[in-house]
């Protein structure tokens, strides 16, 4: 089992369009952001991990920021993420999240994101076989370029912002969000 990440092109669009500088679920092998959180701080901390997203991100409560969240596709983890995002969207500082989760319509995390009216917008469904990730087992890759992995199931791409996030990183016509969606598609 390994953890996949978005392509560097998709992350570059997140960074240029919405100022994404934090990655909530990554590893030293698949991170795109300089500041990232991972599950194994005991080993990943040597490579820059800030620890668990669930316990250390609160240090940014006075600063805010723009985050990319692609959690392990496990409902319990996604529910914890939902609770943390919900709390962070209540901060008084600008907060933006670009989130990728499986298209599991009946699961509470997906339902909550679909139901957002005050802090969520620009919801996109990405079809199976219609989006790519970079495989998380790069250490085994003997090629020079990353191995792209085509998803085997549908996923949803969400943009969630509080009022400060909307003011700092506006996207009235969803052009910037659509560019991120485009970068997930198979080239």
Enumerate the language-model features and the residues they cover.
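Class I S-adenosyl-L-methionine
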Residues: 1-69, 73-187
